[in-house]
Amino acid sequence: MISSLNPLFTTHRSGVIAQQFFASSAAASINSVSSLKIAACSKTKLVDQSPLRQSGNHQLLSSDFNHLQSLKNDYAEEKYKSRCEVLKEQVKMMLDQEMDVVNQLELIDDLQRLGLSYHFGDEITSVLSGIYNRKSMNKMRNQWGLYATCLEFRLLRQHGFDVSQEIFDCFKDEKGDFRPSLCEDSKGMLYLYEASYLESENEESNLEMARRFAAKTLKKNLDEKRVDQDLVALVQHALELPLHWRMMRLEARWFIDIYEERSNRNPILLELAKLDFNIVQAAHQNDLTYTLRWWRSTCLAEKLTFARDMMVENFFWTVGIISDPQRGNGRRILTKVVALITAIDDIYDCYGTLDELEVFTTAVERWDVNSIDQLPDCMKICFLALYNFVNEMAYDALKEQGVNIIPYLRKSWADLCKAYLQEAKWFFSGEVPTLQQYLNNAWISISAPAFLVHAYFCVDYPINKDHLQYLDNYHKIIRCSAMILRLTNDLGTSPESEVLNVGDVPKSIRCYMKETGACEEKAREHLRFLITEAWKQMEEAQTLDSPFSSTFNGIAVNLARMGLCMYQHGDGHGHQNSEPRDRILSLLFEPICCLA
């Protein structure tokens, strides 16, 4: 439970959260899994009866195994990698050369948005450290104006530097309000809006005030057509969802097209961005074919006919969370984790009786293959697939690092299954919990803690034994990431019909409405407020409190971003409309045209 989110019904100003954020959620397709359950199953015994089983009505991206196995990407060839290395050296020279501070910041910002910054981590840190430690910066800021100040603030905070929000006080009048004359500077307003999302918990409301002011101004300037044409797409994009909340790999694909149209584009950066995108895509395709072969070898798709067979979608999650090409092994392991989570989720959602689910949960808690004898064969196979996967992962860790990680992996799966079981009990009893009761369980049932525990052992090498207690207790950064993922999921998968169907598994919107008597829109507004508060907590957790590496912290943040990516336009995981499909195709299967 995230104790700091306890005051769930406190009167609040929701502020301005991205103008189109989940605007279409009410029209999204509901996750039909829960509506397929039959309450009569709650009384079904394991023997002497054959309960009626339901199959999920899932609308998924086609995963033609033979076609996907035959994928061939020319950008895996050495000649493209060699050209990429030449371009990287030229960019390093740019970062090393003397230039105006604002130009340095703009170069770093472009590298990040083009998806190239992972190549230049040391160089970027060196440049930003120099800017941060320069004693003359306060005098320079007075000459910069709003745009450059906001850019500096955002980049420094993104990279963990302690920058006070008082940096914006020089743009306020004697009453403490932002000066009205700033409204004429749409570029400055855009960058103020983006910077305002780098807000930490327990800060004064300066950044919230900045966000409201900037959003209102940008929307007004758009309506009155007072935004420069080369900024219109960027402003609309930001108001839909802020940069800091976006899935960065998808953002890179979008920004490459925007950057190409800029009059001041750097041809070296543009060529490198396109080439690197395609090379990384080739690496991702290689990882995808590996995980597809693994999935076929488990036979889970054939044995669990009611479950979602969606390895492409599962892999898309891991690409959004850990996209660097050198992290292929971690991507493969985590795709397996997502696949197993999806299969087990469907067992609890649309297959198992309550008695069977209790047996399955106990077996996972005890980590005991002898506990599954009474279960249907498909549930036995699923348990053994999980059992073998976890034990194999733990074997590799023990062999290579001398650390037994089974207790931590087991606990994460046991906690997940217990949370699934609690939801099943609520369904079978027809009970609608309070919002706090729901969230205390739901941040675990969204599966983020289990995913992040496995992610830690994939990316932090060698394993730091001092970190394990924080992992076992689900450190704040894990809980915040999980809460954001849960709330975005609920916003994206809870249309009006879900609220009205008494038999469905309750979600946060329905819980809030029942407890407070609020209308659906007020409930959604409250969830958006909770998402913003969780982001503030996560900002503070990763900069001040987290014992983990920056790599792991980044994965936790990226998992939250994936929630916004997948559920922004409805249920992008279980019921895809054209938007999620197009995103998957553009990232995994469609290279960018690179002219020779």
From Swiss-Prot:
Supply the EC number(s): 4.2.3.-, 4.2.3.15, 4.2.3.106
Chain sites annotated for binding (2E)-geranyl diphosphate? R308, D345, D349, R486, N489
Could you tell me which SUPFAM superfamilies the record lists for this protein?
A: Terpenoid cyclases/Protein prenyltransferases, Terpenoid synthases
Which of this chain's residues are annotated to bind Mg(2+) 3? N489, T493, S497
Location comes to:
Plastid, Chloroplast
**Matching Pfam families, A to Z?**
Terpene_synth, Terpene_synth_C
Q: In which pathway does it act?
A: Secondary metabolite biosynthesis; terpenoid biosynthesis
Span(s) of short sequence motif DDXXD motif: 345-349
What does the note accompanying the cofactor annotation read?
A: Binds 3 Mg(2+) or Mn(2+) ions per subunit.
One Gene Ontology cellular component: chloroplast
Tissue-specificity statement: Expressed in flowers and fruits.
Q: Which cofactor does it need?
A: Mg(2+); Mn(2+)
Q: Where is the transit peptide?
A: 1-39
Please give the catalytic activity noted in the UniProt record.
Answer: (2E)-geranyl diphosphate = beta-myrcene + diphosphate; (2E)-geranyl diphosphate + H2O = linalool + diphosphate; (2E)-geranyl diphosphate = (Z)-beta-ocimene + diphosphate; (2E)-geranyl diphosphate = (E)-beta-ocimene + diphosphate
Q: Provide the residue positions that the database annotates as binding Mg(2+) 2.
A: D345, D349
- Which Gene3D superfamilies does this one have? Farnesyl Diphosphate Synthase, Terpene synthase, N-terminal domain
In alphabetical order, the GO MF annotations are: magnesium ion binding; myrcene synthase activity
Is Chloroplast a UniProt keyword of this protein? Answer: yes
Q: What class of enzyme is it?
A: lyase
- Annotated residues that bind Mg(2+) 1 are located at D345, D349
Query: Which BP terms in the Gene Ontology apply to this protein?
Result: diterpenoid biosynthetic process; monoterpenoid metabolic process
Q: Which UniProt keywords apply?
A: Chloroplast, Lyase, Magnesium, Metal-binding, Plastid, Transit peptide
Describe the subunit structure: Monomer.
Q: What is known of its domains?
A: The Asp-Asp-Xaa-Xaa-Asp/Glu (DDXXD/E) motif is important for the catalytic activity, presumably through binding to Mg(2+).
Family to which this protein belongs? Belongs to the terpene synthase family. Tpsb subfamily.
This one is known as Linalool synthase TPS3, chloroplastic
Its source organism is: Coffea arabica (Arabian coffee)
